[in-house]
Curated annotation (Swiss-Prot):
This is Phage-like element PBSX protein XepA. It comes from Bacillus subtilis (strain 168). To B.subtilis YqxG/YqdC. Not known; does not seem to be involved in host cell lysis. Transmembrane segments: none annotated. It comes from the Bacteria.
Length: 279
């Protein structure tokens, strides 16, 4: 078996974490127990104490390149359990997949397709302290989150959005900007955004007002105004209104006919509310 050496920079917590290994000629070398070079990257090689756990720093899969699936490998001289976990806010985590790792056996998870924004690998050691431990990850990018679990061949009728070889005809997402309020000095509903097939909306609230309140509304097919909740982008809190400024809010607007950002009150300056809708 070919063996490679890697240097592991430490993360800000002082422990080898979610960092890409690289070959170097300085110090802190380790030798992986399996030749996975070019297929996987090493997350950690630090041995764990009895019942100790390793948690990868939360990874945002919606970056410049979409990460659609992940796979993990673990090797240890003591048994343990490898988890793949997901989160919507990089705070509360749920287990998507888990595999028991026997002592002295390089063990892999299946490819796991991701559905939430953040993912991480977590390894929980058993009741005996390790002497050897190494954890790898592989990622798959740019794939659609579609899986078929049928064991028998499926009868397929090609739809209008498919080519004859079964490939999807993909349309690019459409985006458009919209101004709800521009330097408003008084309370008002402002302009209503026609949803027109848009699915997501990012709204910015900013201005010089000393005090203000903006309430978030969605109009249903009957014309009724319904409160909608947005997610504040800097801390992932949710609310149906805001008293702040210099903020950005994300909304799921599917099913509504119009979106309204109503200025309920304003004193001592102006306020602007603008958004970008994505189909």
């Amino acid at each position: 078996m070919v063996k490679y050496q890697y240097e592991f920079p430490l993360d800000k917590a002082g422990k080898a974490g979610a960092v890409k290994p690289y070959r170097g000629g300085k110090n802190d070398f380790v030798t992986p127990v399996s030749n996975l070079s070019g297929v996987a990257e090493i997350l950690t090689n630090a041995a764990l104490k009895a019942t100790e756990a390793y948690s990868q720093l939360g990874q945002d899969r919606l970056g410049a390149v979409l990460i659609s699936k992940v796979k993990g490998w673990a090797y240890a001289d003591r048994e343990g359990t490898l988890f793949i976990e997901e989160s919507d806010n990089n705070n509360v985590w749920t287990t998507t997949a888990a595999v028991n790792v026997a002592a002295g056996v390089l063990t892999a998870t299946d490819w796991v397709y991701l559905s939430k924004r953040y993912y991480r690998f977590r390894y929980v050691n058993g009741n005996l302290q390790q002497s050897e431990f190494v954890l790898y990850q592989s990622v798959g990018a740019g794939e659609m989150d579609v899986r078929v679990n049928e064991k028998t061949p499926l009868q397929i009728d090609f739809a209008e959005n498919q080519t004859h070889d079964g490939r999807l005809k993909v349309e690019a997402r459409k985006t458009f900007d919209f101004v709800f309020h521009e330097n408003a000095e008084s309370a008002s509903e402002g302009a209503a955004l026609p949803v027109d097939g848009a699915a997501h909306l990012l709204v910015e609230v900013y201005g010089t007002a000393e005090m203000s309140e903006v309430k978030f509304w969605g109009k249903s097919v009957s014309g009724q105004k319904l409160p909608i909740r947005g997610v504040k982008t800097d801390d992932a809190t949710t609310a149906s209104s805001t008293l702040g400024k210099a903020e950005a809010w994300a909304f799921d607007i599917k099913g509504f006919k119009e979106i309204i950002m109503e200025i309920i009150s304003i004193t001592g300056g102006t306020l602007s509310v603008k958004g970008t809708a994505v189909s």
